[in-house]
């Protein structure tokens, strides 16, 4: 009976998922007109104090943007991006406190 109880308790441990990037707008590798916002949507709610994103141009220069983290998304508000290539680098932490990092690129058309 004790073995059965121990087996049941071991099987009942919580399953933790990580806050992985589910979608982005603009999408990775997309060519778009200058976007008013960049939205990253994750697979679970984020810990705002430990999640964020940065935007850089093709030369790697950081582009200043307003940022918002709430629920399962990160929103960047760029101001008039010029034509060219851009890279979004993000980091997310969900309720399991595991940090995930990633990036994607997109192009702004003339």
Kindly label every feature range from the protein language model.
Residues 12-14:
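N-terminal signal peptide c-region/cleavage motif recognized by signal peptidases
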Residues 17-25:
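Cleaved targeting-peptide boundary
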Residues 27-31:
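Short beta-strand segments of immunoglobulin-like
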Residues 33, 37-44, 97-110:
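Extended, polar beta-sheet/loop recognition surfaces of beta-rich domains
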Residues 38-40, 44-63:
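Short, surface-exposed alpha-helix to beta-strand junction/turn motifs within ectodomains of secreted
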Residues 65-70:
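Short beta-strand segments within Ig-like beta-sandwich modules, predominantly Fibronectin type-III
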Residues 82-88:
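A glycine-anchored, Pro-Gly-centered beta-turn/N-cap motif
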Residues 91-95:
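Beta-strand-rich extracellular modules
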């Amino acid at each position: 009976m004790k073995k059965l109880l121990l087996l049941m308790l071991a099987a009942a441990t919580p399953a933790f998922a990580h806050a992985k990037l589910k979608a982005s707008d603009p999408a990775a590798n997309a060519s778009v007109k200058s976007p008013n916002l960049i939205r990253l949507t994750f697979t679970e709610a984020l810990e705002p104090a430990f999640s964020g994103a940065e935007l850089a141009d093709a030369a790697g220069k950081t582009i200043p943007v307003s940022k918002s983290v709430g629920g399962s998304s990160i929103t960047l508000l760029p101001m008039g991006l010029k034509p060219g290539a851009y890279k979004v680098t993000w980091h997310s932490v969900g309720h399991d406190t595991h940090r995930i990092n990633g990036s994607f690129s997109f192009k702004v058309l003339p």
